[in-house]
Amino acid sequence: MNASEFRRRGKEMVDYVADYLEGIEGRQVFPDVDPGYLRPLIPTTAPQEPETFEAIIEDIEKIIMPGVTHWHSPYFFAYFPTASSYPAMLADMLCGAIGCIGFSWAASPACTELETVMMDWLGKMLQLPEAFLAGEAGEGGGVIQGTASEATLVALLAARTKVTRHLQAASPELMQAAIMEKLVAYASDQAHSSVEKAGLIGGVRLKAIPSDGKFAMRASALQEALERDKAAGLIPFFVVATLGTTSCCSFDNLLEVGPICHEEGLWLHVDAAYAGSAFICPEFRHLLNGVEFADSFNFNPHKWLLVNFDCSAMWVKKRTDLTGAFRLDPVYLRHSHQDSGLITDYRHWQLPLGRRFRSLKMWFVFRMYGVKGLQAYIRKHVQLSHAFEALVRQDTRFEICAEVILGLVCFRLKGSNKLNEALLESINSAKKIHLVPCSLRDRFVLRFAICSRTVELAHVQLAWEHIQEMAATVLRAQGEEKAEIKN
């Protein structure tokens, strides 16, 4: 493909993408395929001779689209949103065209410097404490990670290195292995599974702190665990506080947990993967109060801030905590400015070496939407979730299972887990809408997350009517089953 054909095909692809997104409401949200459907439809080996663009596009509709779950359908209410916007897509095209691998300032100065500035822009939108911003001479700063899972792992590994070096400096005879076997990290029992995975990868034990009646980690439960473990000769070193849990969007009490971490000298990492986007709205900023106690903070613009995947924003108060843990300088990566103190080499802030020019997406989206446009988008989703909550509360067969704060509603039929499992199965089998469940205190709960950029109140109302219809069918079947047993 030469430049001339690329121009033509590029325009065709833009039309295809625009048509797909404009018509996505008409596509079934969840596919009608079985595991392994695709392999028989594709040759077992790559073609020896070039194929045409037309043939590939034809196969997209014939082979790929039938197996796609349409995350951007206005009838997709599962998981949490994955962001998408036209400005972000255009920026991603440019990122692919430039094709730099920005592991150091010298590898692509614009890639590095735009990321630093965009992370400061975003930090100011969130009203983060000044200590988290790079500024012109700050000790902190932001970095784009691939996912919140990566950010948590990076924070844990940096904290592990920091505490190990501190203990060895005080007692040089201590071996790293002896320290490692005593290290303990903590998170709420509602924390994301990636926190547990970080502990597994980091080789440290992770303890779940029981959450309160609102599914939040509180000071008393954390303090009790710390005292018990210290008395047993263990070494607490790392705490993850979650703002907006995956199960029910609950919020750990940062204003209680933060001071304890500060007093105990524990690294506090704040994971706000979903909820963090909402903090750009003044009315939701209070949910971030206490972040001043954190050593690191992370959220995903690629969830709810119209910047498509992958773009996970992470800030640290002391960049040397990261660079001290991950810095390696082989000859082939060195450059003349690396020790000048004037530049950032982001390879020392992350696990991989390579990195894409992801800040372009942020730059395009922030400029083309403006802060007010992004705030309006967040507020619309929150309004729709409360509209759905109101519909649920009007039907006495159902109950709300957790406080509705942002764009997620947790609800269920009053009754057994088996009944609610049957309801979810019937909803997803019909494939008009798509939901996923969670477990709250051993209760099977349905999650209704406002996800699509194009979702409107009418879609929410239609979804609720469908849920009611499925509920009536399930309840009727349950009644018939009970009648048969009785007879």
Curated annotation (Swiss-Prot):
GO BP annotations listed: amino acid metabolic process; carboxylic acid metabolic process; catecholamine metabolic process; dopamine biosynthetic process; serotonin biosynthetic process
MF-aspect GO terms: 5-hydroxy-L-tryptophan decarboxylase activity; aromatic-L-amino-acid decarboxylase activity; L-dopa decarboxylase activity; pyridoxal phosphate binding
Residues binding substrate: T82, H192
CC annotations in GO: cytoplasm
One Pfam family recorded for the sequence: Pyridoxal_deC
Catalysis: reaction(s): L-dopa + H(+) = dopamine + CO2; 5-hydroxy-L-tryptophan + H(+) = serotonin + CO2
Keyword Ribosomal protein: no
Sites bearing N6-(pyridoxal phosphate)lysine, chain numbering: K303
Residue positions binding pyridoxal 5'-phosphate: A148, S149, T246, N300
Keywords recorded for this protein, A-Z: Acetylation, Catecholamine biosynthesis, Decarboxylase, Lyase, Pyridoxal phosphate, Repeat
Cofactor section: pyridoxal 5'-phosphate
Keyword presence, Acetylation: yes
InterPro entries per UniProt: Aromatic_deC, PyrdxlP-dep_de-COase, PyrdxlP-dep_Trfase, PyrdxlP-dep_Trfase_major, PyrdxlP-dep_Trfase_small, Pyridoxal-P_BS
Stretch list, region 2 X approximate tandem repeats: 58-178
Family named by the database record: Belongs to the group II decarboxylase family.
Subunit structure: Homodimer.
Identification of the protein by name: Aromatic-L-amino-acid decarboxylase
Organism: Bos taurus (Bovine)
